[in-house]
Each structure stands twice: as structure tokens, then as C-alpha cells.
Amino acid sequence: MDDRMVDQALHSEETSFELSLRPTMLKQYIGQSSIKNNLEVFIKAAKLREEPLDHVLLFGPPGLGKTTLSNIIANEMNVNIRTVSGPSLDRPGDLAAILSGLQPGDVLFIDEIHRLSSTVEEVLYSAMEDFFIDIIIGKGDEARSIRIDLPPFTLVGATTRAGSLTGPLRDRFGVHLRLEYYNENDLKEIIIRTAEVLNTKIDDESATELAKRSRGTPRVANRLLKRVRDFQQVNEDEQIYIETTKQALQLLQVDAEGLDYIDHKMMRCIINQYDGGPVGLDTIAVSIGEERITIEDVYEPFLIQKGFIERTPRGRKATAFAYEHFKNFNK
């Protein structure tokens, strides 16, 4: 699967770019007002008690700000943060080494926490609940268990698949926060802020247009802005104008609803090849040359959310809204 302009996942070359745009405190964070309000209370209460914040589970689609929020939590609590990904923790010893290096109150951020192995996850149980871990030293008859006490800390776990977490792990988080897709007003505000960080001027109409096509995701909004800025600079315009924005988005193949060429390919398959469906995912996968799991996890969710596809017992079916949007397919 090639990197897409509207892909919600982080592209490998975008890490430093995203870091430069991330807000560092809650007051700078745009959107997710319910989460912000709750975190403000939880953090203030923890600081008044002089205790670490309860363990926090952040879940929701990619690109909505889970990593940013984890860093904001550490900044607001005025503590250090250690960041790891679930798949990188192969053995219990890997996690034990990280936990034993934490200072009192520190934040441990585990991204993709749903991908922890069961043996590593079990080490977390006592660490989260009672702040100790048991490590087995030696093998066979000489094996013995050593208890290591840990300083109180805050675990922040992030996942796009909250349903994949085991009950015992999920229940050990005191704070559960679901990140929702952003509305266009919040995305527009993010785009204007990013333009300022990039020292780029953008007109109001362009910011609105980019927000409409960003699939409710700040990461997509910032990526599109960065590419439109390329067109503006090559054109030697003093700012990003709506004409340049529309031209750039057309060339980037991102339509008015935020759909790209792969979305179009999939919808064309359902509408034209299979008369709007219903058609099974395996059949769609073969027809467009993609894996079923990629369609199910990456392409399909946004199309369902936007009302282009509906799930039926017999397969996927194009909606009336989809026919209206793609009415020029056969012309």
C-alpha cells in the first residue's frame, strides 16, 4: 500500500514535521473539548494531592492527537515522559528495564498498547496496580523470583483498537478517553495555526476548503496544507489563495469529500462492476488488488462514516449518497 495523502497513519518522513507542530500544553490544544475539560480537572486534582495522575487510556482512530496528548499530560504534570511502542517490547525484561528507570511521577507512554505480547502485558498488571514487578532470575532449579519496587508513575496507553485490549489490562486504567473525529471549525483553526508555525499566509476560503477535505483528522489537514504550500511557493504567490488550493487538491486527487484515488477505485468497483452491491469484501479485494484486511481496517471505515457504503449481511452496498457523489462515473 502506497502512502496516501489522506492516510491517517503517520508517514515515516513526517515525524520531525509533526513534532514541530505539536502543542505542548492543554491551553494550546485545539478540539476534543470534552477530553480537555476532563483532563484539566484530573491533572489539577492529582497535583493538589501531590500524586501521579491515574493511568490513562487514549483510544480512537489514528492521527487525532493521542501522542500529542500524552506529551501534554507529562508537561502539565511537570514530569518526564518515556515513549515506547507495544511491538518493540519483545520480552518482560525489556519492560522491566524501562519501568525500573522511571522517576517518581513520570509518564510511560506505550503506543499501540493492544500489540503487547501476553507475557509483557502480565508484567504490567502489578506495575500498574501496586507499583512493583516480579522478575525471574536464572533457569530450572536455580530460578528464583526477585521483587522490584517501582516509584509511582502514570501509564498512558494509546490504541486504535480498544476492543482488542484484554479486560484485565483495560480495567487497570483509571481514565478512559475516546478521541473523536474533528469538526471542520476545529480543523480550520488547526490549519491556520499550522500555517503560522510554517510562516505561511493562507486566506480564509483556503483554510475552509482544506478543513472540508481533511477527513476529520489534523494529521491529514497538516499534510494537505504542506503540499498546497508547495504550489503556492512555486507560483510565487504572497499567500495561499483558494485558486491555488483547489488546483493543488485536484492534482493531489483529493475530492470535495476528502476521498482519494483509492476510495474512488473502491467505489467504482462496487457501483460499476457490481451494480452497487451488495458485494463481499473478498470480491472487492480481488477486484481492486488489495488485501481484505487493508480494505477493512484502512479504506472502508471512512467510507462508512461518511455514508458512502453500508454493511449488509450479504456484503457492502453503495448508498444513494454514493451514487449522487459518483454520478459522473459512467459519463
Curated annotation (Swiss-Prot):
Keywords: ATP-binding, Cytoplasm, DNA damage, DNA recombination, DNA repair, DNA-binding, Hydrolase, Nucleotide-binding. InterPro entries: AAA+_ATPase (IPR003593), AAA_lid_4 (IPR041445), DNA_helicase_Holl-junc_RuvB (IPR004605), P-loop_NTPase (IPR027417), RuvB-like_N (IPR008824), RuvB_C (IPR008823), WH-like_DNA-bd_sf (IPR036388), WH_DNA-bd_sf (IPR036390). ATP binds at L21, R22, G63, K66, T67, T68, E129, D130, F131, R172, Y182, R219. GO terms for cellular component: cytoplasm; Holliday junction resolvase complex. It catalyses: ATP + H2O = ADP + phosphate + H(+). The keyword Cytoplasm applies. CDD domains: AAA (cd00009). DNA binds at R292, R311, R316. Residues 1-182 are annotated as: Large ATPase domain (RuvB-L). It is found in: Cytoplasm. The keyword Nucleotide-binding applies. Mg(2+) binds at T67. Residues 256-331 are annotated as: Head domain (RuvB-H). Belongs to the RuvB family. The RuvA-RuvB-RuvC complex processes Holliday junction (HJ) DNA during genetic recombination and DNA repair, while the RuvA-RuvB complex plays an important role in the rescue of blocked DNA replication forks via replication fork reversal (RFR). RuvA specifically binds to HJ cruciform DNA, conferring on it an open structure. The RuvB hexamer acts as an ATP-dependent pump, pulling dsDNA into and through the RuvAB complex. RuvB forms 2 homohexamers on either side of HJ DNA bound by 1 or 2 RuvA tetramers; 4 subunits per hexamer contact DNA at a time. Homohexamer. Forms an RuvA(8)-RuvB(12)-Holliday junction (HJ) complex. HJ DNA is sandwiched between 2 RuvA tetramers; dsDNA enters through RuvA and exits via RuvB. An RuvB hexamer assembles on each DNA strand where it exits the tetramer. Each RuvB hexamer is contacted by two RuvA subunits (via domain III) on 2 adjacent RuvB subunits; this complex drives branch migration. In the full resolvosome a probable DNA-RuvA(4)-RuvB(12)-RuvC(2) complex forms which resolves the HJ. PANTHER family: HOLLIDAY JUNCTION BRANCH MIGRATION COMPLEX SUBUNIT RUVB, PTHR42848. NCBIfam families: PRK00080.1, ruvB. This is Holliday junction branch migration complex subunit RuvB.
